[in-house]
Amino acid sequence: MVSATKTSIAVFFLDCMSLSICIECREPAKRGDYMKMGNIRYGLVLVFRRASLLTFAILFCLTSGTAAAQRQTLLEYPSIHSPQVGLQGMVVSQNEIASEVGARILAEGGNAIDAAVAVGFALAVTLPRAGNIGGDGFLTAYVSGQKKVTVIDFRSTAPQNAKLEMFLDEKGEETDTASVGYRAAAVPGTVAGLELAHKQYGKLPWAQLIAPATALARDGVVLSADEAFVFGWGKKRLQASESAKGAFFKADGSGYRAGERLVQSDLAWTLDEIAKGGADAFYRGEIAARIEADMQQQGGLITRSDLAAYRAIEREPLSSTYRGYTIYTAPPASGGVTLLTMLNILENFDLSKYEPGSADAVHLLAETMRLGNRDRIAHLGDTAFAKVPLEGLISKKYAADRAKLIKPRKASKDAAIKAGNPADYESPSTTHYSVADSEGNLVSVTYTLGSDFGSGAMIAGTGILLNNQMNN
């Protein structure tokens, strides 16, 4: 672990696919030194300070050493998976082009919130399987000037006309209606959430943050091999609408190949409208009119009144401690409480005895995640409609009891794991990106369409691919 001082911050970005870690140590910096990283499948940002703060975290292979010594070692490590260092800021996302957009915003004088907004819109163009303006998510930020951690909740909401029986068969089982097609879409929250974050904490003009995404949609993006491949296996879902087929496949039905340019003219129009009119353009303007018209034609549920009623919400973060550090994450309906539960369970084990990447280490993590996710399935929900036993789920005593279920030489079977009863401890396909700037601001964003390519339904004339969150 990089030693934390009053003038240094260590930021760990963990790629859960390649297990790479990116570390930034804040010291007196040279201007113009920005770091961007792309092609990160999933990113989670861990922040250590003497005062201690954290957005999202997964940790296991932490060692000791000074910041300067660590940085020198990191710079010399000859691997594409080695940690990367940036002195003025860092942007990590799943797509290199979107990461470049964020780094450019930082270089233009924007802060981490500005860059996070720009990356969010850029990913809607460059990573349409998960990046979005038709989905939802959570933004967790440390605002350096105010010395506070805050959460922007832009989770989607069910349309007023939605009824449970619409999504169930005669046996009461969920049908594909909740996953594919226009009825699967909940009211999107991304545009409202990004605007709220910008209004509260951004610096640069709103339109400046959306301009890069608009240009990418208008001029086209050259597809990588991975992106071209993903359109192939997502083809069946994207048959849910003629607009999606027309946007992502050629006239003869064939897919775009790696190296070919994908132009999204309708999406460019939508982004331009949002740049000029803000979230109002999306929820109350011509975009809203087009959403309602297509919903009516295709049998969907979202109306203009649903869109006009939507609000993103700024919330207090959920927090706990891990080995002396305070950890902050998004509250329900996010899965942040599950992260805290897992860390509390891990706190009952001496991790220094485990070799990183060893069978024993992987076993411990797998069993911990099984326990945490079993409770997530049983107990988590939207606190506006359900009572979630938060205090119990993040209780140290509850975690200690759950940790006793882990057998060091035996893997548990999923069917054998039952949810615990955290109430006894009470009193009375998605993408992630992270941004840090030279001012000490830190932003962690997880947003999604639900499944890869969401519902597969695209609103005619807008390029907006909709989520399938009604299956949640």
Positions of predicted regions on the chain:
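A short, polar/charged loop-to-alpha-helix boundary motif
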Residues: 452-467
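Short alpha-helix boundary/capping segments
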Residues: 1-8
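Internal maturation/activation junctions in enzymes
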Residues: 349-448, 462, 469-470
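Cysteine-centered motifs
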Residues: 16, 22-25, 61
